[in-house]
Amino acid sequence: MRRNLFKHILWILILAECFPLLAIAGSQQKEQRYKIAVCDWMILKRQKIGSFQLVHELNGDGVELDMGGLGKREMFDNKLREPHFQQLFRETAQKYQLEVSSIAMSGFYGQSFLERANYKDLVQDCLHAMKVMNAKVAFLPLGGIKAGWEKIPALRTEVVKRLKEVGDMAASEGVVIGIETQLDAKGDVKLLKEINSPGIKIYFKFQNALENGRDLCKELKILGKKRICQIHCTDTDGVTLPYNERLDMNKVKKTLDKMGWIGSVSYTHLRA
């Protein structure tokens, strides 16, 4: 199973150079519009130095580093608190000329951000790791919160309160936390307005729109370029991206071009 997952991740990334979404938008453009990052935990290298060499060999632009496992731990299993690993990760990224596009708190896929009393400490740990690796975006999935929270006033109020607090923490350090929800684009826009923090934006995930039968490009347009900090280019319909009939990458690229969006696109779940 691991061999198949690894093989298909390699295949997708090798194809990345000729994939339209990854191209520089316009021959006269000096700055690369779309940069490609790979999530380290999805190539079985969560907080492992080897992720940099692999992404370099595949001509990627950066790595989305995870904070480490969470589970029932009080804090993330995070190596980036230790000076030795801080230096090692920085030097390795520099060696391979790779950016750390974002720092991910993927532990919140399984653990509820709403139920963690020490949520500020966990986010502060991430903000510190971002400073260490010079990353400007954090990834915070809300998947661990029990479904339906957005329709229960007391739960929604608490989620908004917590996101406002950590968003302001991020903004004070000049960085952004990108949240992933199961809401549609209009729902995300409403949530962002309620949070009202410059430190919270949307980390848009293709899979959520596609699995819920939403028009992916319309969702992107509704959100607009200023509300999307980064994108997870992923789907789980059973095929690799070049053969995915419900994900039209040419159309997605044209949509992002028209929106004027510039940023990093991270690959996560890539399956055969």
Residue ranges and their predicted role:
Residues 51-68:
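Catalytic domains of carbohydrate-active enzymes, especially glycoside hydrolases
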Residues 66-88, 145-147:
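Glycine-rich, proline-tolerant flexible connector loops at the mouths of alpha/beta enzymes
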